[in-house]
Structure formats: C-alpha cells, structure tokens
UniProtKB/Swiss-Prot annotation:
The gene is hisE. This is Phosphoribosyl-ATP pyrophosphatase. It comes from Lacticaseibacillus paracasei (strain ATCC 334 / BCRC 17002 / CCUG 31169 / CIP 107868 / KCTC 3260 / NRRL B-441). Its EC number is 3.6.1.31. Belongs to the PRA-PH family. The lineage of its organism: Bacteria, Bacillati, Bacillota, Bacilli, Lactobacillales. One of its GO terms (cellular component) is cytoplasm. InterPro entries: HisE, PRib-ATP_PPHydrolase-like.
Length: 110
C-alpha cells in the first residue's frame, strides 16, 4: 500500500488558505465566491453520486466520488468555521459507546 501524499488535514489547510488568499480562476475560490448555497448544492450532488457509484460493486468511480464528496465537505467545514480537530473530537467522543437501536429511526429497505 502506498502512502497517501494528501492527508485530510493537509487538504483542509489548503482549502482554508485558499479562502484567506483567493486565487482567481480556482475552483475553490469559485465555491467560496458563490457562497454557502452553492457549496451545499455541491455536497448534495456529490453525496448522490457516491450513493449511485456504491450500488455497483465493480464501479471504480466510487473512490473518485468519495474523494470529491470529501473535498466538498471540507469546503463546507471551512465555510462554516468547523475544524478537522472538532470532527475528530466528536468522533472520539463516540468511541466505545453502545448503540441504542431502539432510539434510532427504523431504516426501511427501498
């Protein structure tokens, strides 16, 4: 397995830097210029594309779509002022907790 050259925290920092110092013509700058509604639209689109790609187990697009969704979620996090550390803290707070299925909404098969 090769080591990833781009970590999620590094990508987050890159996006945050682009927000602070826009580069004309960059896609990241475009998203921040268009604002929250455009960013939310892209997160929704990418989420749908992940779901569609996941339905086909042989679809190599799944990894591409998960990467695109991750990027757009990170843009959303920067826009909202949420850090990677905040997400890591929330995930850590859930570690080892028992799931109480009776408290969750039932997921129906579609």
């Amino acid at each position: 397995m090769t080591q990833a050259k781009q970590s999620i925290p590094a990508l987050y920092d890159f996006i945050k830097e682009r927000q602070a110092n826009p580069v004309a013509g960059s896609y990241t700058d475009y998203l921040f210029t268009k604002g929250l509604d455009k960013i939310l639209k892209k997160v929704g689109e990418e989420s749908t594309e992940v779901i569609v790609a996941a339905k086909n187990p042989d679809d190599p697009a799944f990894i591409l779509e998960v990467a695109a969704l991750t990027y757009h979620v990170l843009v959303l996090m920067v826009e909202r002022g949420i850090t990677v550390d905040q997400i890591a803290t929330e995930l850590a707070s859930r570690e080892g907790k028992k799931s109480r299925l009776q408290e969750r909404s039932k997921i129906e098969k579609y």
